[in-house]
Amino acid sequence: MKFDCAIIGGGLAGLLCGLALNQHGLRSVIISRGQSALHFSSASLDLLSALPNGDHVTDVAQGLQQLAEQLPEHPYSRLGAEAVLKYATQTEALLAACGAVMQGDARRPHRRVTPLGTLRPAWLSPLEVPVAPLPSQGACLVGISGFADFQPHLAAAALGQHGVTAAAVEIELPLLDVLRDNPTEFRAANIARVLDDENMWPALHAALLPLAQQYDLLIMPACFGLADDRLYHWLQARLPCPLRLLPTLPPSVPGMRLHSQLQRQFIREGGAWLAGDEVVKISHRQDAVEAVWTRNHGDIALRPRFTVLASGSFFSNGLVATRDSVREPILGLDLHQTLPRESWYQRDFFASQPWQRFGVKTDALLRPLLGGQPFHNLFAIGSLLGGFDAIQLGCGGGVCAVTALHAARQIHALAGGRP
């Protein structure tokens, strides 16, 4: 099977790379083992929230310049501030084309409300997510009776520390009784499958209406809208006060919807999607990938002109750890790695952990190294890359997006298109 590009991994980085290649007229295939980390995410993306020295970033352009001085091995530092901001802007347009309506600005982070009521910097957030500043009075956090993945009283207390006085109430929704018999079924994704039925919308509206008449803002868990945001806009049009939604503990409905929107657009534009498959071997000669072999296709190889590794970090098995080593399991690529094992972590749980910086080494074009030499038609993107701590710096989503679009641009140029 011949393709212009084979993308290994169907998460945020892989999908954005595939979508960008579609726009360049290149035919690509994504090999996906299963659910990506997007299913467990809030669907908010961060670009750069903090610097290695602990300073908070309020101006991203300036922060990128400081990052290059403090952490030259960071993917942003290698690409340059101008390129990072350009790719971030292109990502916003890509997401909008997929129907993912976001709020935010690449140059200046906003602060979104988390499920625990804290404020966290973000680059892009779904339109329904509450962001600062919130009204100091008149907000109400609405829980669902029996739903343990969102605690309105805890969130209200945390918002109080930020000067927001919010009430906390729970609503009864008898239509969800079918899920209550088994606590493991009473999760956001399963609730959404019930509430997304248009026949159930009036019952949810009836439960929220008395609160909407009493308060100036309602904030409830994001437990509807798996496929689209029709119910959210339907409620917005009928409630007398604004409604906002908070992502819950995983699986996250906004994250699942974002993944679905990107995947549908990729396939709609002609991309191929190999679901539930896994790459077991990549054949290469000297510095060129020749074939990609998957578990489900046996002796039928994919023969792409270019290959992109978007297989993720430890969470997605893009990296595998043993007792004394970490490796990239498909090719055994060179890694950023700290040895010995005792130095993989710090005893302070909340400190930046060295293992978070493990990942594949690449050249300036994001081509991974094997024995110190890059492949000329293989690229690595997203959280598989090493040299940075995405949690400490608040840059995980941004690295996925920026490196995905950079790799797509390199492939387009090498394939004969204009750079």
UniProtKB/Swiss-Prot annotation:
Recorded catalytic activity of this chain's protein: a quinone + sn-glycerol 3-phosphate = dihydroxyacetone phosphate + a quinol
Lineage top rank: taxon: Bacteria
GO CC annotation: glycerol-3-phosphate dehydrogenase (FAD) complex
EC numbers, comma separated: 1.1.5.3
Record's protein name: Anaerobic glycerol-3-phosphate dehydrogenase subunit B
Gene: glpB
A GO molecular-function descriptor: glycerol-3-phosphate dehydrogenase (quinone) activity
One Pfam family per UniProt: FAD_binding_2
Aminoacyl-tRNA synthetase listed as a keyword: no
Description of how the protein assembles with itself and partners: Composed of a catalytic GlpA/B dimer and of membrane bound GlpC.
SUPFAM superfamilies named among the record's database cross-references: FAD/NAD(P)-binding domain (SSF51905)
